[in-house]
């Protein structure tokens, strides 16, 4: 068996990636979230596949087909709620994974980091088109509002929106193509994940100390496979509690009303994991400016390798930048809260302050604190 896994052309790749992979001996539980994301992706693809067997992407039957899945299909309700809440678990793991990357300076591995950001954007696109599929009120109006933002693009905006809609409004053509996108994108994500791992294994993993760990590495199996299995057990427990006891806690009650183009909901808002970006979008009065800010709120992550001037790797020994980092996390939580609030005073003002602070922390405060800490080291 040992000879086979080391010499067989296919098993050799798996062996070098998951069994004999030299791994730093000191990586903490914050490094578990990569494997948890892989687990989430597998859950989403499997549950999504079973849902697609019963779902119909037609405006007249989409809503009733989801109701049929929940009522008439064997364990259809469980598959549906695992898929819906699995998306939330996916994004929780994704946010922690990115947050850990920023805290421990993993962005210095720029190829891995940039592929990760492309993965983040692709996952957001997949979640957005997926949210439209049940064809409830919030699905329909969310699709209308978000796709309509593209009309802010000069010259080609209106044409682009109609091209995406497949007509002059969100209708049957839109739903059909969104279902097609939602089906294909997870497989594209899987391909990107393999590229992400390829780049990661080229350089080796980062570690909490930020020091070179080449002199102190251990094989991935059995040490980290056991550790990852424990993380997966916790994730599955949390997901089952969410899906079985609180299946609708993260959803919107408006989505239990069939889509009606003649009746606009009082507050149009996306799923909770998009609220921080939605708050940034809403805080800018200009439509094009809002769309650019929305894009930059994610793409700004690509600036981390360029803005990093610190002599030290990660924030573990850098108290000033550490404090700024936690202010950034608090700021993102405020933005998430604001995104779910109505567009009125004082929420608009808080949103504008939090949006400015978000960009200021990343573009100004963090590079300044890097320079200050570099000078302190010289003393």
Swiss-Prot record:
One of its GO terms (biological process) is mitochondrial electron transport, ubiquinol to cytochrome c. InterPro entries: Cyt_b/b6_C, Cyt_b/b6_C_sf, Cyt_b/b6_N, Cytb/b6-like_sf, Cytochrome_b, Cytochrome_b_C_euk/bac, Cytochrome_b_N_euk/bac, Di-haem_cyt_TM. Keywords: Electron transport, Heme, Iron, Membrane, Metal-binding, Mitochondrion, Mitochondrion inner membrane, Respiratory chain, Transmembrane, Transmembrane helix, Transport, Ubiquinone. Its cofactor is heme b. Its main location: mitochondrion. Heme b b566 binds at residues 97, 196. GO terms for cellular component: mitochondrial inner membrane; respiratory chain complex III. Binds 2 heme b groups non-covalently. Heme b b562 binds at residues 83, 182. GO terms for molecular function: metal ion binding; ubiquinol-cytochrome-c reductase activity. The keyword Membrane applies. A ubiquinone binds at residue 201. The chain crosses the membrane at residues 33-53, 77-98, 113-133, 178-198, 226-246, 288-308, 320-340, 347-367. It is a multi-pass membrane protein. It is found in: Mitochondrion inner membrane. Disulfide bonds: none annotated. SUPFAM superfamilies: a domain/subunit of cytochrome bc1 complex (Ubiquinol-cytochrome c reductase) (SSF81648), Transmembrane di-heme cytochromes (SSF81342). Pfam families: Cytochrom_B_C, Cytochrome_B. The cytochrome bc1 complex contains 11 subunits: 3 respiratory subunits (MT-CYB, CYC1 and UQCRFS1), 2 core proteins (UQCRC1 and UQCRC2) and 6 low-molecular weight proteins (UQCRH/QCR6, UQCRB/QCR7, UQCRQ/QCR8, UQCR10/QCR9, UQCR11/QCR10 and a cleavage product of UQCRFS1). This cytochrome bc1 complex then forms a dimer. Component of the ubiquinol-cytochrome c reductase complex (complex III or cytochrome b-c1 complex) that is part of the mitochondrial respiratory chain. The b-c1 complex mediates electron transfer from ubiquinol to cytochrome c. Contributes to the generation of a proton gradient across the mitochondrial membrane that is then used for ATP synthesis. Belongs to the cytochrome b family. Heme 1 (or BL or b562) is low-potential and absorbs at about 562 nm, and heme 2 (or BH or b566) is high-potential and absorbs at about 566 nm. PANTHER family: CYTOCHROME B. This is Cytochrome b. It comes from Akodon dolores. The gene is MT-CYB.
């Amino acid at each position: 068996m040992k000879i086979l896994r080391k010499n067989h052309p296919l098993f050799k790749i798996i062996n070098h990636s998951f069994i004999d992979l030299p791994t730093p001996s000191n990586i903490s539980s914050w490094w578990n979230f990569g494997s948890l994301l892989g687990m989430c992706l597998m859950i989403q693809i499997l549950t999504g596949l079973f849902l697609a067997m019963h779902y119909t992407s037609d405006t007249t039957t989409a809503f009733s087909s989801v109701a049929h899945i929940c009522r008439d299909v064997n364990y259809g309700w469980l598959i549906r709620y695992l898929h819906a809440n699995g998306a939330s678990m996916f994004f929780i793991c994704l946010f922690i994974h990115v947050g850990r990357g920023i805290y421990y300076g993993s962005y210095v591995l720029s190829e891995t980091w940039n592929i990760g950001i492309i993965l983040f954007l692709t996952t957001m696109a997949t979640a957005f088109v997926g949210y439209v599929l049940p064809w409830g009120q919030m699905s329909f109006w969310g699709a209308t509002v978000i796709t309509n933002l593209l009309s802010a693009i000069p010259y080609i905006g209106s044409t682009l929106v109609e091209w995406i809609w497949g007509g002059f409004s969100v209708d049957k053509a839109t739903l059909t193509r969104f279902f097609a996108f939602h089906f294909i994108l997870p497989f594209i994500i899987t391909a990107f994940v393999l590229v992400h791992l390829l780049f990661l294994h080229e350089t080796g993993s980062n570690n909490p100390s930020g020091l070179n760990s080449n002199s102190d590495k251990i094989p991935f199996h059995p040490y980290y496979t056991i550790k990852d299995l424990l993380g997966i057990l916790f994730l599955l427990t949390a997901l089952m509690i969410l899906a079985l006891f609180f299946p609708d806690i993260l959803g919107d009650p408006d989505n239990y009303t069939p889509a009606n183009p003649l009746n606009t909901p009082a507050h149009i808002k996306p799923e909770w994991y998009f609220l921080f970006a939605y708050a940034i979008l809403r805080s800018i009065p200009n439509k094009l400016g809002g769309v650019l800010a929305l894009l930059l709120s994610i793409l700004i992550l690509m600036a981390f390798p360029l803005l990093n001037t610190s002599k030290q790797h990660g924030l573990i020994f850098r108290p000033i930048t550490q404090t700024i980092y936690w202010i950034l996390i608090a700021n993102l939580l405020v933005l998430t809260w604001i995104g779910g609030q109505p567009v009125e005073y004082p929420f608009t003002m808080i949103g504008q302050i939090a949006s400015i602070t978000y960009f200021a922390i990343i573009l100004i405060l963090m590079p300044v604190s890097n320079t200050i800490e570099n000078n302190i080291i010289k003393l």
